[in-house]
Amino acid sequence: MALTVHAQFSVSPNDASSLKWMSIESPYFRVIYPQGCDSLARVYLLQLDRYRPAVGRSLGMSSGDFYHKRLDVLLHTQNRRSNGMVTWAPSRVELNTIPEWTNPSAMPWPAMLALHEGRHTAQMQNGHRNVFGALFYVLGQAIPGAACAYPGRLFLEGDAVVAETALSASGRGRSAAFLNTYWYSFDNGDRRNWMKWRNGSVYRNSPDHYAFGYLVLSGIRTAYDAPSFMEDYFSYVSRRPYDFWPFRHVLKNTSGKKFRYAYPQILRQHYYEWTADAARRMPFMPAEQLSQPTRRLTAYRNPNVTASGDLLWVKADIYHTPALYMLSGSANGSCGVGGPSGERRLLSVGSDIGKMNYVAADSLLVWTQTHIHPRWGQKNKTVVCTYHIPSGKRSVLVRGDSYIYPVEADSARIAAINYSEQGGSSIDMIDVRSGKVVERLCVPDSLQPVQITYIEPYVYAAAISDSGYGIWRTNGAQWENILPPIPVQIASLKNQDGDLTFGSDWNGQWEMFRYDVDRRQLTQISNSRYGGIDYCLCPNGDLSFSTVGENGSRVMLTRADCLYNRQVRWEEYHHYPIADTLSAQEARLAGEYSDCAQLHHGSKHVGGKGETPAETTGPKPYRKAANALRVHSWAPCYVEMDAVSSLSLESVKNVASLGAMAFFQNSMSTLSGYAGYKAARDPQRGKWFHSGHINLTYSGLYPVFELKADVNDRNKQTYRYNEARDTLFRHNTSAPSVQASLKSYVPLGWDNGVLKYGVVPSVGVHYTNDVFEEQINLLFSAGVRGYVMQHTPAAAVYPHLGIGAEICWAQPFLYEYVYGYVPGICCGQGLKLTAVWQQTLSASHFLHTAARLMPRGFGAFPMCYYDGAKFTADYAAPFYMGDWHILDMFYCTRGTVTPFFDYSLVKGSGSSSKGGYPSGSLCSAGVDFELDFSTFFWVRTPVKCGIRYFYNGGSAYGAVFEANPSCGGFGPSGRHGISFLFSADF
């Protein structure tokens, strides 16, 4: 049986080693940030302190209530992928401070992070109370981290979305697109059960755990007037961690109903609100489908239209990565006259891109693409890319600064938004040919511009303020507000014949609006049942947009004479009754009454009285050396970590031993590892060994260093070779054994959104005090590996195309390894080919090997070879199994059948009758059948399990089987075999 288990504490990508760090403190938080960002750090510290009592009020616990130490908050100022993370083991908060720019909520980014991540810090307090609190003294911070396995990401993230919605005037619960997939599904009879909505699907349109968690928890709070439901849930879990169905039991206590009756009522609570709102918005405009009907999950994004009516869309499905497609138009400006069959692929673009915009003067598409630094995972930039439609040429216009939302300014310039690492932003005018900045417009600190457009002589910006989204304009001298900020979202701001067009969820669904900047009149252009995801107007006045469908999204078209075209008042925006009820509950808990209408005026947040920011210290240098060794978890036993990562039935009993361990990692994730003591008895000699172990990784410099040492695992050994007897003698001395290794490598990797490629050079040395023919064994190694491959689609196992190679000298061997991927016969299928070759550079009586040359059907075969080669072929064929589950215990997402063939040519050391190793060929042919689980024995983590059948053969098989019958399977010659497969990633 082959098991593979990967488990580790949370290690984050690293910031650039050149950064100098500072810190600032309050009674509950210590913010660690790069030098030169003092003002930015103070903003985040004040926001975290401001919301700390409020975000924990309905949970019954706030950050610092049970864990009485300042919580480290690490600010990443060079990461353009806006996000936040709270993790325990070690406890810390990590915030990417560059504001969200792809689909931001209608609140400033620091407030969003303080609310959402602040709720997570409150949730983590549950790991320090009741049963978990007692276990904390035994295992340290590993317990709060493990306690999160009970609610899982569904409840943790859903509860955080409830908090950000209830404690603000916006949040994702007040975003029209957030739950839209559910409304389409419910309208069309798609009533998936709890497990299918909760676990999602690779093959069916399913929102993520943020959306479903909010749907369920907000429904519970409003349907049963239970604002403290999550407080009851966490309290129950901390007192009864042995209960595998805590949610069902707490829900029954809250609702008085069994789960099978309460769950439909929760969904109806939301659906009734949706249907009432849809009835209010009728009548809806007609639309015809332009995109090709498909049964596979497909998404259309980023629309643009040329002067001739050619529609340009970014399309992706579960079998293909995102690419730019064109749907041909006509000379009179009609869009999509070619019909679905006229869809034509232009180029791959990747998924990590910004909004595409069309530059008519040069027939260009311009957009931003995120490029990650080859070494530092927390450092990346957004480059401006262009695509010339007539020639099909793609190029990078600006590589230096990072920009978002590039648009046409005039015939010679484009305008783009630049977010500063120190906070603040600007709008830069860039020469379209040289890529140089020719003018820079400063943006007030109170605004975060998200989209811009140019109508001479003004630059218009849709921006976020404390009160929500609004539209401002500037001619370079001053900024003027032309559409007041309100808590709704705005997207795709464009210049349409001198007017502004944009999408907004102003009326409860994403619709398109037109704003006459001279008359100050706002017109709602579209009105559809499910709204649109992206809109663009065709030259003849038709409206093209994408909207939710059964299999993702689809491209629709509404003719110009059928558009909604009604004037509306911007201030009369849609209210969300469930979200307003959540806010009223929070106000009630805070001991004050707040009218829901007041919540939507300005930037009012539901907090409570007496929540003024705490006193903070001044900035001071953060000493990385002084904070390097941070012990966060421990164990009253010793665990063989290498054995855990490659677990087999034979080694299960050897995984844990008497002893103790301590795990350490600094808050910056540059130094991590463990130290341990083990007491073990030699079963043959009866002697007890008291050994010490250390494993350390340091990644704070360009090269990564890994140190591993084991002392007194056994006695030191000496080996001598007797030529007369052709025998190797081993002698155990009384001295302790010392084994140590040091490895250094530079993990360089690039990703342009379409291809991933990298180079990893490495060197290493291994020391042992064992004596081989009167010589201490000091083995050196050096190598380099490289790869280039496409991204792997969601429903595939392998990349569509890719190749990699490695060459390594590991004294006394030289080996080369090559692998590649090619597409299979059907979508999602693929073929992986590998070849490995090993050669001995110097003879030795002490056999070991650098590469495994045995076919996989031979299992843990003890023989090893000096020289040889191995070739393998795996054909992976994944298939949909209907997302089946067994109660709440198991949830299977798909199956995979993988026929394989391994062929080895090996050079032995003589005949097997004289104790040597036979030469010749060995092969294994067989098939793996694996199931992918997202829930396995109630634990929500990726798990694969399956079965392997194999047949062994080759010219050397008879001699190998005679020498080691355990290498075979069943049957008279042991050629057939079956083994079980299992792998998990915690």
Describe each model-derived feature in a short phrase.
Residues 7-146, 152, 160:
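Juxtacatalytic substrate-recognition/specificity segment
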Residues 11-16, 86, 90, 105-113, ...:
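Acidic/His/Gly-enriched intrinsically disordered linker/tail segments
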Residues 12-15, 20-23, 204-207, 231-357, ...:
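Beta/coil-rich, acidic/histidine-enriched accessory regions frequently appended to metallopeptidases
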Residues 173, 177, 315-324, 348-354, ...:
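A flexible loop/linker signature enriched in serine peptidases of the S9 family
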Residues 276-299, 327-356, 386-403, 420, ...:
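Multi-bladed beta-propeller domains
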Residues 283, 296-298, 302, 566-700, ...:
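Outer-membrane beta-barrel initiation region
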Residues 510, 531-533, 550-553, 685, ...:
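Outer-membrane beta-barrel translocator/channel fold
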Residues 730, 771-918, 957-974, 980-986:
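C-terminal outer-membrane beta-barrel translocator/porin domains of Gram-negative envelope proteins
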